Amino acid sequence: MMETTKRAEIDTTAPFRTVKEAVALFGERVLASQVYSNHLKVMHDEKWEDPSGIKIELQETRYDLKRAKEESIQMRNSLSCLKEELERTKQELQKLRVDPGVNETKLDETVFKTKFEVLVPRVDDEPIRSPRLRSMSEKRYVKFANPTGNNGSVFLERHPSMKKKEKKTKDKKKKSLIPLFIGGIFSKKKVLQ
C-alpha cells in the first residue's frame, strides 16, 4: 500500500508591512485590548475623574508657554543687538581698509593720550607714581631664623624614610648580581664525550 503524504504550505511572509496598517485594519482596541486593557481603563478614569487636576495642568502649561515666549523675545533682542554690533564693526573695518594711513595716526594719538598707572597704596594712603619707588614698595622679603651651630653651618640629614629606601636599593643590587653570576655558570651546555 502506498501512503500518500500531503504537504501543507505555510505562508511566511509578513502579514502587514507596517504597524500602522495593522492598526488601521483591526483598530487599536482589538490589538491592545489583551495587553493594556486594565492600564487603559485606569488612565481613562484618571483623566476624567479630577477636573481640578486638568485645570492645574492647564495653568502650568500656560506658565511654561509664557516663560518660553519671554525667553524667545529676549533671544531675539540679543540677536538683533549682536547683528547691529556686527554691522558697526564691519563698517569700521571697511573704513580702515579704505583709509589705512589716516586711521593709524588717530590710533597712535589715542595710544599716546592714554596713560596707564599702577597705584600702590602706601601707609599714609598716598599713591606712589615713580616707577623706581613703586618697584621697591612692591618687593617682598622673607627673613629666616638664625641657624643653630658653632660656625653657622647647618648639617641637613636625610629623612628616615629615605634612609630605608637607600638600604632597600643596596640590598636589591647585591641580590641581582648573584643570580646573574650563578645563572651564567650553570646555563652552559655540557659537552657529551
Swiss-Prot record:
The keyword Cell wall biogenesis/degradation does not apply. Belongs to the WEB family. Residues 161-174 have a biased composition (Basic residues). The keyword Repressor does not apply. Residues 57-99 form a coiled coil. PANTHER family: HEAVY CHAIN, PUTATIVE, EXPRESSED-RELATED-RELATED (PTHR32054), OS04G0116200 PROTEIN (PTHR32054:SF9). It comes from Arabidopsis thaliana. This is WEB family protein At1g75720. Keywords: Coiled coil. It comes from the Eukaryota. Residues 152-174 are annotated as: Disordered.
